[in-house]
Structures are given as C-alpha cells and as structure tokens.
Amino acid sequence: SGVSQGTREAMNMNKKEVTEIKKLFTKERCCLNRLCGCYVDADKNKVVQFKEAFLSLPEEEIYKYLDIFRKSLSGTLGKNLLNMEFPLEQEMGDGTQKSLLALRDSELKDDVMLDAFYDRMIETYYHPENYLILLVHGSYDIPMKTSDGMEMDDASDYIYNFVLCCLCPVTLSKAGLCYNAETNSIEDRIRDWMVDLPEQGFLFPAFQDRNTDIHRLLYYSKNANELCPDITEQLLGCVQPIPAGQQKESFQAIIEDTLGEECVYDVVRNIHENLNEMIEEQKENGEPLELDKMQVRKLLERSGAPEANLEQFEKQYDEEIGAQMTVMANNISDTRKFEVKTPQMTVKVSPEQAGLVETRMIDGVPCLVIPLTDEVEVNGIHVHLRDEEVLKNLE
C-alpha cells in the first residue's frame, strides 16, 4: 500500500469522510497503535506524562479513551468541526506543518519531540484549571470502494497515518455522600480528579477524498462560538475562521448596512428563501455550503437588492468578514424557522410557509398579514373563526 499526500487544491473534509474516521474509534475497527499524554496543573506544571501501546490497555480504559476520541469528531461541520489550511510559509523550514508531520511520522515514539510538543501547547494554551493533553497515533488501511459504495476490506491502495490531539479539562468530582460496601455505611465521598470530554482537539493530516491531505487539518471546538486562537493560529499556524455566531452577526450587519433604507421585508424574506434553497441543493454533496464574497453579492442581487446599494457591498463585506474570508450558509441562516419580531410580539413560521406572511398598509398602519386556516389555537384552545369576524378584522 502507498501513501498519498494530497494537493493544495481547496477541498475540505465532508460529513462522510468525518464519519469514516470516527468509525475507527470503536473496539471492532480500532486502528490506533500508540497513546501518549501529559497531565498539566493550573500553574502550567507537567504533573505526569505517559505513553502506552493503545491496544494493550485494560479494556475498560480503551472504551473510555475511544469515547473521548469520538467526541473530538462530533458536532457540525463549519461550527464545531472546522477545516483549516496551512499557509504556504508554514510548510517550509521550521513551519508548524513541518513539525506536525515530523510528530506524525515519529509515530509518537520520539520523547524529545513529544516534550517539545507538550511545551509548546502549555506555553500557548490558556486554561485556568487542570487539563490533560492526549495524543494518539493511528494507521488506517483505506479499503477500496466499489462503484456502488461497498467497501472491499481485502483491497487497499493507501494507508492514512494520522495523529489526533485532544485537550480534556480535569475537574474534581462533586462532593457528596456515598455508600461504602466494605464498611456497610453511608459516608463522605472521596473527591477524584476526573478527565472530562475534550474542549478542543485536532486531527492531522485531514482525510480528504478518502486519502491523506497534509495541507489541512480538522479542528474541533466544543463551543462553536469560542474558538481558541492560541492553538489555531499560534500553535498550529492556521488561519482561524470566524466563529459561527459572529458569522451570523456579521452577515446581518452587511445586509443592514448595504441595503440601508432598502432593507425591506420582501428583500430579507427573499434572501432567507434563496439561501435555504442553496443549502438544500448542496446537501446532496454531503458538504456544507460555503459562500465567498462574490457568492454573497449574487445572493443579494438575486433577492432584489437594488444595484445602487450593492456598490457599498464590497466595502461592508471586507470590513465585517474580510475580503478573502468565507461564511458557512448554515451559520447565517436558520433552515428550521422563519421569524418576524417586533418589541410587542414574535411570529414564527415554518420556512416553507414564509411566503404566506405579507406586509400591508391598512388604514395607514403598516401591518403583518397572515392568512388563517380553520385550525387556530389560542393558548392551546381550538377556536372557530366566523366569516364576519375575519371580514371585520380585514376591513
């Protein structure tokens, strides 16, 4: 079997590829061979370091570690799971990508290299409490697939060698009483330092097009809105994408500032509907929809934004997001609801029915008009609508 390195062509790990690697973190399909770790206290001291042949660990421990590793590949692509690319300068000389490649190629057997990695992590990562740095090395003999997607376990062209890093908080278990079977009594429970599921992690190299991509990695953050630039930018040397929540705020600001007085209900509703349509079309590819500056401009244009207002768009986009940065469509649009809000009320409509809600001037007052069917509930009580009531309210 050979090893492919991937190209610099812009491609990201998709959901299927993440799932394929995640399935390796089970006892039945496990291809992990070496585990290393460093327990760090709140004062940044190394308390203990360890290295083990992964499959020689007690079975219960193996299952606990596999839970941690699976967690670091969970969540939503573009939110908790972020595809990150190394800038070209990090692939040369003493660049971060070079040092990660050396770490992977050592199969975590070089103590000097491991120490250097732990030192860099401790120096750059800010965590106010105790935490555990976990590193695991694996070798996946990638099975070939038939044209109908069936795996051929006995046929393989490439081996995917990788390292997975997880940063797990270590916290004191809760105080309380417990039953002691030896003394047959209820007593104060001894509090233990427990390893929690990871808050940050990364998989290197990326697994793209069912192969190795040394130009990228997959980053995990438990909280999609609190990424860790200490790790992503300083330790890994990658360009950190804008957090999911901030992408939505920036997109909303771009629309409001670009459209100005033309930021009317119909245009905003069209943007929402067109965006959801694009997301649905992209679902077939198994990869989340990513929009660059020109694609966002086309979206506004298609949704009825006046040409005169779009002259301001590029400036607004560059200021809010960045000329070369992209946004994930799922981060800027909620495909599950369409919401209209005023200080007095909130109206939520399923996105498919958004076209039913209109704005009209009635007796000189701007109103929101929603057609009613015969299925109307008020505080859970089914009510009947008389024709004269409906007509009277519309007059």
Language-model regions: role of each:
Residues 1-12:
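Short, Lys/Arg-enriched N-terminal segments with co-localized hydrophobic residues
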Residues 14-17:
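Extended alpha-helical interaction scaffolds
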Residues 19-28:
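Short N-terminal leader segment in a subset of presequences, especially plant chloroplast
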Residues 27-29, 33-334:
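Long, hydrophobic alpha/beta structural blocks
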Residues 301-395:
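C-terminal, beta-strand-rich globular interaction domains
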